[in-house]
């Protein structure tokens, strides 16, 4: 009971708002399956909403997919508005972030659970959203934000969604004009992403049994669809 209460207290509004937006009238919420509580139970489908940190679900997903169909729902911010507040909740500034989220950003999280791609009972749905992020300069946040803390994340709008029902669906990530044998650098160039993101993608697809390593292409690793 205490664990459930702490979970609720630590959740951003985004988590509960996604659950509400994603749910159907017949869904059940916060249902116990074995030793776990799942966000939504839709018939025989257990649904987990995770806004970040896929690694926190690793054990839960591995265990539940042995007996149940499990879907992970991930809200990916396409557009973000950043609201800066003072300690008294006064709004100091509000601006639109110049960064626009892309589907390939998913793999920054998926690298934590890449093996799940090849699990038959596992599916993943990405929701492309607009969100508001509320920040407070309290010196307790990430060094990347110079100590600014994220105090709240709010759902503004669900724009679109894409479902990865099986491992083969992940091939849609790869550009159509990619060579039969390709490198991370070639993938990065065609997809207009960083080499680091390309490496995350090929790592996940290899672990999920979607592509394989076929040796070297020049000095770089060469990959091929299975």
Please place each PLM-identified region on the residue numbering.
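Long, low-complexity, charged/polar intrinsically disordered regions in eukaryotic proteins
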Residues: 94-165
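Short acidic, hydrophobic short linear motifs in intrinsically disordered regions
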Residues: 178-191
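Short, cationic-aromatic polyanion-contact patches
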Residues: 216-226
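Acidic-basic catalytic patches of nuclease active cores, encompassing PD-(D/E)XK
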Residues: 1-37
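Conserved catalytic cores of phosphodiester-cleaving nucleases, focusing on short active-site segments
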Residues: 38-53, 57, 64
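A short, conserved structural fragment
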Residues: 206-217
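Short amphipathic alpha-helical interaction segments
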Residues: 193-206
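Long, charge-dense
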Residues: 69-113
């Amino acid at each position: 009971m205490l664990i459930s209460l702490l979970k609720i207290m630590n959740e951003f509004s985004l988590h509960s708002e996604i659950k509400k937006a994603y749910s159907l009238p017949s869904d059940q919420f916060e249902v116990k399956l074995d030793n776990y509580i799942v966000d939504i139970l839709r018939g025989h489908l257990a649904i987990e909403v995770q806004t970040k940190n896929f690694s926190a679900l690793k054990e839960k997903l591995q265990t539940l997919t042995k007996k149940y169909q499990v879907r992970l729902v991930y809200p990916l911010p396409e557009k973000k508005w950043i609201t800066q507040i003072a300690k008294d909740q006064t709004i100091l500034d509000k601006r639109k972030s110049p960064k626009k989220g892309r589907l390939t950003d998913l793999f920054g999280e998926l690298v934590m659970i890449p093996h799940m791609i090849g699990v038959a009972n596992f599916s993943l749905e990405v929701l492309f959203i607009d969100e508001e992020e509320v920040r407070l300069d309290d010196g307790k946040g990430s060094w990347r934000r110079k100590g600014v803390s994220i105090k709240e994340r709010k759902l503004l709008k669900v724009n679109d969604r894409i479902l990865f029902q099986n491992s083969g669906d992940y091939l849609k990530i790869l550009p159509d004009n990619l060579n039969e044998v390709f490198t991370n650098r070639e993938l990065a160039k065609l997809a207009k992403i960083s080499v680091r993101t390309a490496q995350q993608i090929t790592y996940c697809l290899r672990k999920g049994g979607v592509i394989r390593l076929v040796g070297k292409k020049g000095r770089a690793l060469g990959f091929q669809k299975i």
